[in-house]
Amino acid sequence: MDITTFLVSSIHDMKNSLSVMTAYMQSALLELPVDAASHSMTYQALYEAQRVNHNMIQLLALYKIHGDMYPFDPVEVELAIFQSEIIARIQPLVAAKGIALEVVMDEIERNWYFDYELIAALVTQSLHNAVKYTHDRVRLSMLVVDEQLEIRVDDNGEGFPPLMLAQSFPAPQGINGNTGSTGLGLYFAARAAKLHRNRSRTGSTRIENGGTLGGGSFILHLP
């Protein structure tokens, strides 16, 4: 076994263990009184465990994408069900932090083709970031705009720093000395989006400030 295979196997094993840990902590949060001294600490532990777990999922997916090994599998997805499953993933953190989570959907029920696991991972990660940096509001919207599915995550925090807005994340970034960010999440999102194609259109991502809530906005377009 070469070192790369060993590292990938180890990351996969750690990811599975973290998934079990987060499930236990989610159950603990539901049973703990909100005013209990351990409630905020359990919430923070859950957030950090989920953040690391998401990073490992992204690393494994990127390894497979770079090696042309990722089993890209676009399927027809009912957006209303997809939205409810994403909300279920983030709800324990939202409730623990007292965040107002808003959801905006097309009035017409719609289905869309995309790789469920890839898109679920990047949207969930974006919501986690919004919950971390918002003041008290986060909005998830899924609307068809210009014949593309537009998934937006908006918050009312301070927004993205100028340096991050100036970077397009075409390649993995080093650690930012000011923010501590590696840019992994945005790089993963961009690569995952670009796998989705329909005729001449390709999936894309961008970040901006302002948006619908005045803070940071993450926007994903899927053709």
What are these regions (language model features)?
Residues 155:
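Acidic ATP/Mg2+-coordinating residue in the GHKL
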Residues 75-76, 100-110:
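Conserved catalytic submotifs in the C-terminal HATPase_c
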Residues 194-211:
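Glycine-rich ATP-binding loops of the HATPase_c
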Residues 47-55:
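Short alpha-helical segment of the dimerization/phosphotransfer core of two-component systems
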Residues 160-173:
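Short conserved segment of the HATPase_c
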Residues 67-72, 111-114:
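Conserved micro-motifs of the catalytic ATP-binding
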Residues 137-147:
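Short beta-strand/loop element within the Bergerat-fold HATPase_c
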